[in-house]
Regions:
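Bacterial Sec-dependent N-terminal signal peptides
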Residues: 1-14
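N-terminal carbohydrate-binding accessory modules
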Residues: 14-95, 129
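Substrate-binding/catalytic cleft of secreted carbohydrate-active enzymes
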Residues: 35-40, 140, 144-183, 189-340, ...
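Aromatic- and acidic-residue-enriched carbohydrate-binding clefts of CAZyme catalytic domains
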Residues: 60, 99, 104-120, 148-179, ...
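Aromatic- and glycine-enriched glycan-recognition loops and surfaces
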Residues: 72-90, 111-132, 232-233, 543-552, ...
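Aromatic-lined substrate-binding rim segments of carbohydrate-active enzymes
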Residues: 81-158, 237-243
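Carbohydrate-binding surfaces of carbohydrate-active enzymes
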Residues: 181-195, 199, 206-215, 220-221, ...
Length: 732
């Protein structure tokens, strides 16, 4: 196992844009079956296979409550997919949802939009096939923008090299600019050709497959394009989807321009509600539902992302340590969605994962556990138990509740913090929703209506349904949760790792010249590992190095630059949002140049698109100046290759003669560890984690794989090592 660490003390914060979720413009509105549908049935290519009305999703002529789990195949090692699918199936889910990141599937730059030689869609095809094998419906979300706390929001690093000199708008990504649309078609063509054979409409009746195809993502976040241009963009994306034989319903999320379109390809499109309300469910989730009902009359309520946890960011708290993410919240928010009439819910995330290598967005932790029901390491937890109980409820009652009407009911409650809402099915069955958002105590009491009285007992922040069949005098409380899982008491041995050696990273022996104004991605290097730079500057002068500074990109911290002259590091002289300055040693009166070696650390590519992100899209230093004059640069990108090689038992390259000065203080160090894992007891499984205390930032490599980044600032100190990458019973 190898750690490549630059010993720096840094800080980091990533501020997520919550503007869409916190929009306060919605009017109060209650849907009770009185709206007229605006859906033209012709929008459904195969209404006999899949369609929807204002209350329910219908598959092969039957109402189906879509109980969906977000599972990112690109965040879980492929040999472990089957384990996660099995747990989803056992958890009662009937659907799985995934983003499809463009940059994951096309890692090298094609020559033109017609060049498909750099695309590799096999992993997506394998994932869709496995979902079908487990009997799950699938929702696909190919962006092109996916957010997902993923590098570049899913856009390839090379995409900005395709941006024309003149564009329709200052910001290019997610615009209807003609050249950008050509590249969108390039991507969608590949996705559609992969997805099309897996659609439900291409399967025999009774089989599962892809049921929804989402175009774009969270488009309300984009405020810098006119609404007419945004709508045109969505229309053209939808036309591309249909052109390449996607015939299941098209959906969107957080996209006003797709709401209530009376004709054309967007007619009938459901714009889904995404909500992460934590403890304030009725206030925050309820407001978004009201907005959806007001702006999408006659459309079903579907949640594209309902809170199943939350991300962790560098310098913040790990997911399970955050407030408002307890499993009881999952039950409460689900029952509130049912109370409001939802017919489809996708929980983001349900399967936790890992931001392997450098794929995480700017300053995101390596772990993407998300406090999900199925953890990053594959274990299940109390949230999973809640989902199992909710799944049984939805299987028996989900579509009946969705088609039930809200009846006005006057009631008194002995506990003023407990509220009641009644939905009544067409056959007279009653569903009394009993909820509280008070979370400091248990709630015991009695509710009395004009014709019925019952006692309740709720946990803190509890929610239950009292189900009263038509004509019955007594009912049942739902959901019924399964017993907690009994776990083996066998524990894995803790293995204390002793470093085999600490090695200074040898300076590169080969350097590549950069043209003025170019970045290393212009040479086809798209990774964001450490980069060495070299230049020659007049001694005694002030060196200015251009890089992303503190809070320049969505409040994140600065990229780091370590500068060395004559084998010694230089302290930072001063810095601002755009540059960091170093005082070069020597007498400026003597006209002599010194060699300057720099190590650059990128904090990653942000997952939001906006002009400032596009302006700083390139990988590496923006410039190096001295006395106002821009200096020529050479670079070497060696750390990633060395890490993979060393972790497989290789050696650092031998020193060879080079004109570069050897460093007394290395800019980058390697820490090598080896260990033997014992065989696991028969019938017992446990995951392995690396617990790491360290200074500086770096990358973790093991057995030829890059696990991800390690950040001095934390909060992550334990790193899940996929068992399929470990040599169980042997040396690692």
């Amino acid at each position: 196992m190898l750690l490549g660490i630059t010993p720096l003390f840094i800080s980091a914060q990533n501020i997520t844009d919550m503007a869409v979720m916190n929009d306060r413009t919605a009017d109060a509105f209650i849907e009770n079956g009185t709206q007229i549908s605006s859906i033209d049935d012709s929008v459904f290519v195969h209404p006999d296979r899949i369609c929807y009305d204002r209350r329910c999703i219908r598959i092969e002529g039957k109402d189906v409550f879509v109980f969906s789990a977000a599972f990112h195949y690109f965040r879980v090692a492929q040999p472990l997919w089957a384990d996660r699918f099995r747990k989803l199936k056992e958890g009662g889910f009937n659907c799985v949802e995934t983003y499809i990141p463009w940059n994951w599937h096309e890692r090298r730059m094609p020559r033109s939009p017609q060049d498909e030689s750099c695309l590799d869609m096999k992993e997506l095809d394998d994932f869709l096939k496995m979902a079908e094998d487990f009997g799950l419906y699938v929702i696909v979300r190919p962006g092109p923008y996916i957010c997902a706390e993923w590098s570049g929001g899913g856009f390839p690093q090379w995409i900005m090299q395709k941006k024309p000199a003149k564009t329709a708008f200052d910001t290019w990504l997610q615009s209807n600019d003609p050249e950008f649309m050509r590249w969108n078609e390039h991507w969608y063509r590949a996705v559609c050709r992969t997805v099309a054979p897996h659609q439900l409409t291409r399967k025999e009746k009774g089989c599962t497959g892809v049921i929804f195809f989402q175009v774009e993502n969270e488009f309300n976040r984009i405020k810098w394009f006119p609404k007419e241009a945004k709508k045109d963009y969505l229309i053209r994306l939808s036309q591309i989807v249909r052109k390449y034989e996607i015939d299941v319903p098209v959906i969107t999320c957080w996209t006003d321009e797709a709401r209530n379109v009376e004709e054309g390809v967007l007619n009938g499109v459901v714009d889904m509600v995404n909500s992460y309300p934590r403890w304030e469910i009725e206030k925050n989730f309820g407001r978004l539902i009201n907005q959806q009902l007001r702006t999408q009359p006659g459309k079903p309520l579907i949640s594209g992302e309902l809170q199943g946890g939350w991300m962790s960011e560098v310098g913040g708290k790990l997911s399970w340590e955050q407030d408002g993410l307890m499993p009881v919240q999952t039950q409460n928010i689900t029952l509130y969605a049912l109370q409001r009439g939802f017919c489809g819910i996708n929980y983001y995330m349900t399967v936790g994962g890992t931001n392997f290598d450098d794929w995480g967005a700017r300053q995101m932790t390596t772990t993407y556990d998300y406090a999900a029901a199925i953890a990053e390491n594959g274990s299940t937890n109390e949230r999973y138990r809640r989902f199992r109980g909710l799944a049984h409820l939805l299987k028996e009652h989900g579509t009946r509740i969705a088609r039930a009407d809200v009846l006005p009911v006057e009631y008194t409650s002995t506990d003023p913090d407990v509220k009641l809402v009644l939905r009544q099915a067409s056959n007279g069955d009653r569903y009394y929703f009993v909820r509280t958002e008070e979370r400091t105590r248990h709630h015991f009491g009695t509710i009395q209506t004009s014709d019925f009285t019952f006692d309740f007992a709720l946990e803190p922040f509890g929610a239950m349904i009292y189900y009263l069949p038509a004509g019955a005098e007594q009912g049942d409380w739902l959901p019924e949760l399964p017993d907690a899982e009994t776990r083996p008491t066998v524990k894995a041995d803790t293995i204390r790792l002793i470093p085999d050696k600490r090695m200074a990273d040898p300076l590169p022996t080969r350097w590549v010249k950069l043209k003025k104004g170019e970045y290393i991605d212009h040479d086809g290097i798209y990774g964001r590992h450490f980069v060495y730079y070299r230049t020659y500057a007049p001694q005694g002068k002030l060196l200015e190095v251009g890089r992303i500074g503190h809070k320049l990109i969505n409040g994140t911290d600065a990229d780091e630059v370590v500068v060395s002259v004559q084998g010694k590091r230089l302290p930072v002289f001063k810095e601002d949002a755009y540059s960091v300055f170093y005082q070069l040693p020597g007498d400026s009166a003597i006209n002599r140049k010194v060699e300057v070696v720099m190590l650059f650390e990128s904090k990653g590519l942000h997952h939001h698109t906006k002009k400032i992100v596009e302006d700083y899209w390139g990988i590496g230093l923006n410039y190096v100046r001295c006395g106002g004059k821009e200096l020529s640069l050479e670079y070497a990108y060696t750390e990633n290759e060395r890490g993979l090689n060393l972790s497989k038992g290789g050696r650092l390259q031998e020193k060879t003669p080079t004109e570069t000065t050897e460093l007394n203080e290395p800019l980058l160090s390697w820490y090598s560890y080896s260990f033997t894992l014992p065989e696991q007891p028969r019938g017992v499984w446990f995951p392995y984690h690396l617990r790491l205390e360290h200074s500086g930032n770096g990358f973790i490599y093991i057995n030829g794989h890059c696990i991800g980044r390690c950040w001095q600032k934390g909060p992550q100190r334990e790193y899940y090592i996929p068992e399929c990458w470990l040599n169980i019973g042997g040396e690692n």
